[in-house]
Amino acid sequence: MSAERFTASGWPHSEVLTGSLRSGGRGNTMFVGNIPRQFVLRHYRRGGLLGKIVRDSYVFTGEDLTRSFKEWRLLDKLATNNMNVPRPAAARFYRRGTFYTADLITVRIPDVIPLSQYIAKKDRGEAFWRSVGQAIWKFHEAGVYHADMNAYNVQVDKDGDIWMLDFDKGSLKSPGPWQQETLGRLHRSLVKVLGLDPKLHFHAANWEELLEGYFDASKSA
């Protein structure tokens, strides 16, 4: 794929993702291309306090260790195994001496919205929350570590199926404490968005339903 495709100007149509559509907020993300064949272009950016100082540069330690190439390889493996993740289309890095910047292009998943937006529309029943837990277990059973599982990166399609976005710093791991830590991160994110919008349809019982779905799936594995 040509270098110009990694910029908004390299596409006839582009739409910057803003607000609740943004997955985690660390990337500069936009839709590019024409429906029905659209892509998501993401420029890697740092988060947190460091991101205010060094916006999008990373120390170069080898081509295979660049953020974009690592995420591309992980997504390719997961998509090949029919996991509900974006299918990777292209990745690149641009080296400047000791540092580099990176970009990733994935195929856009049609008709998905963030979990935070999905539960803002109306109260979702027990079956839905159990399905979220079951979907998370499917990833954990496959050893998939998601570094930033939150109410934005967990997405829901028009059929109510669960998808995962943003596998930056993700990896494949053996079972361990990281599985519970991932669940804890998602719970904190849901509590946080509830604090931002008290009308959100998320209650303690919903989290218990999610956990029931997760652990029931793990027992039947």
Annotate each predicted stretch with a short phrase.
Residues 114-123:
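AlphaC helix of the protein kinase catalytic domain
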Residues 7-113, 137, 141:
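Conserved ATP-binding subdomain of kinase catalytic cores across diverse folds
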Residues 142, 147-149:
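Residue immediately N-terminal to the catalytic "proton-acceptor" Asp
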Residues 124-135:
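Conserved alphaE helix
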Residues 94, 157-159:
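Short beta-strand micro-motifs enriched in acidic
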Residues 108, 149, 167-169:
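Generic detector of well-ordered alpha-helical packing
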Residues 159-221:
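C-lobe/activation-segment region of protein kinase-like
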Residues 149-156:
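Hydrophobic residue at the +6 position relative to the catalytic HRD Asp in the kinase catalytic loop
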